[in-house]
Structure formats: structure tokens, C-alpha cells
Amino acid sequence: LLSGHIPGVSMSHNYLGHSEDCLWTPADWAWIGGLFDILMPGLALGVPVVAAKMKKFLPEATKEIISRGQVRNVFFPPTALRILKASNFEIHNLRSVACGGEPLGAEMLAWGKRNLNLTINEFYGQTECNMVVSNCNAEADPISGLMGKPVPGHKVSVLDQNGVPTEQEGEIAVERGSASMMLEYWRKPEQTENKFYANWLLTGDRGRLHRDGIEFIGRDDDVITSAGYRIGPSEIEDCLLTHPSVATVGVVGKPDQSRNEIVKAYIVLKAGKKADDQMAEVLKDFVKERLAKHLYPREISFLDELPMTITGKVIRKKLREKAVLECEQERK
């Protein structure tokens, strides 16, 4: 309802961005985040995009690219942020930093405020329907544990096993009609049909709907079922990453006869740190002191490196396969 006289209102283009904005991401442009969150919006809105790719993500090279390219806005994959945090990376001339792919915890957000002098915005989406949920610090401070609210133009819900919206844990779904939603899986009509239930695109991600946003629990395959608990790995990973000895980590469920699964952590330590049983116990206790008791990793293995995608995400599927293989070897 509009009431009264509607005057002519002159608006600045600054509403769409700042004149000095300049975009960059270390992510490959073949990834939906690099393509639809950086390259295409930059081209559409006339914002410069820096093309600079590293063979291996390094903090010093990141700082050089930002400086030489006069970058003001960066989209970082979560693993890139973890590497920067582990190196005590610091830069204060960025206007915005965004991240998508995995949830960020309270410690990472606090680090962003200290070392980047800003609040990191979280995005959520997938190739089939990109950036449907987001935090925006220009509107409100993010709430730890929530990945944000539906972006205008998208209707997002959480469905139970019967395809009915629920406030309990369920599958995150997006209603048809979103501009960023796929048309189809190319020449795969059956796979396309299975991606939808009625009018909803099913993401395959588990979540919970709250009044102030949506909680991401994990990929359906990533959720660990242990002694009746359903456990998302991200919270445990984020906790372990706050320990000064941990460089990166992947958490999965390992098959177990009595508990169905146990929480298993695969950890890469920082240079100079000793990977032994004592360190494993220290890290277990570290999690016990900070999270609910059922969340601590009952087993920890140390690796030289973790399997990663080209976009910097830990490939938990390969870690689960490794855990299954360990079980088979233990039975022999």
C-alpha cells in the first residue's frame, strides 16, 4: 500500500557498489562460486575483475595479488581462509570478503574482524541453484551457527522425509522460480526429475530452520550417526582448527559395531609439530572442553595432506573410504 504523494527520488549508483570496487577470487572460474559470484556479476555490473591464478594457494602471493590488482572485494573458498588464518595473514584495505562452500565458525568470524578488519559474509548454494542463502553484515551482524537468511528472490525451506516444511532437522530445499536455478542436467531427464520433489529443488544438504536464519548441518552423506546422535562434521573441524598446532582437518564417520559410527578426524599439523599419540590425546581433550562430549573425535590420524577439490574443499568421501579400509584392515 502506497499512500500520499510519491515524489521523484534521485538515487546514486553507489547503492549497487562503490566506484573503487575490484573483484578477485583464488577459486577456479569453472566453479559456480568463481563464475556466478565473481566473474558474471562483475561483468554485468561493470565492476573490474582481476584474473590471477596460483598453482598453489599461498598467503604471500595472495597479498601481492590484492596489492597489485588494487583488489577490494574477495571471494575465498573456506580452505583458503583457513590457510590465511593459520599463517596469521593480515590486511586491512579490503571492503568485503565472502566465503561459501562450508560453514564458518565463531572463531573464523572473530579472526576476520581482527585480521581483515571486516565481517566475513557467508554464502550458501550449489551449482544447481547458486547463492540462495547469505549473511550480509551491511544489514546485520551474522549469528554464529547460522549461514544466513534466504536471499531476496529465493524461497528456501527445510523439508521432512514426507516433503513437508518442518522446523526440525530436514533437507534444505529451494522453490522453483529462482533465477539462479538450473534448467536441467544436460541430457539427463531422469536425474533432473529426481532432483525435484513437487515444486522444490532438493539440495541433498541437511539443515534446520530458525527464526533468524538457516542452520547448515552437513551434506546428507557427511552427517555422522553415532550412538543415536546425528553429527555434522563442520563444527568439530572448526573447533580443531582453532588449536595452534592444527593446519587443516577433515572429520568423517568411521563404521563402528556398537555406535554405528564414531567421529574420526584426519589432521595435518603445522610445520614443526609432532604427530604422535600424545598430540592426539591433547586434541581430543581440546574438543571435549569446548563442545558437547559426543562430538569429540574418538580417533585421530595424522596425514601429510588431505584430499582436496580444485576449489579448496576437503573431499570427505575419500576420507570415508579411507576409514572403511581401516576397519577392514583392523578385522584381519
Enumerate the predicted regions with their spans.
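Active-site glycine-centered loops adjacent to acidic/histidine catalytic or metal-binding residues
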Residues: 101, 125, 148, 205, ...
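Conserved ATP/PPi-binding loop(s) of AMP-dependent carboxylate-activating enzymes
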Residues: 149-153, 164-194, 231
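Glycine-centered tight turns that cap/initiate beta-strands
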Residues: 93, 117, 153, 245-248, ...
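Acidic/polar alpha-helix N-cap and adjacent early helical turns
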Residues: 321-332
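Gly/Ser/Thr-rich phosphate-binding loop
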Residues: 44, 71-76, 84-142, 155, ...
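AMP-binding/adenylate-forming catalytic core of the ANL superfamily
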Residues: 74, 178, 183-184, 191, ...
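Conserved AMP-binding/adenylation subdomain of ANL enzymes
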Residues: 3-73
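Phosphate-coordination loops involved in phosphoryl transfer and adenosine-cofactor binding
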Residues: 19-20, 94, 169
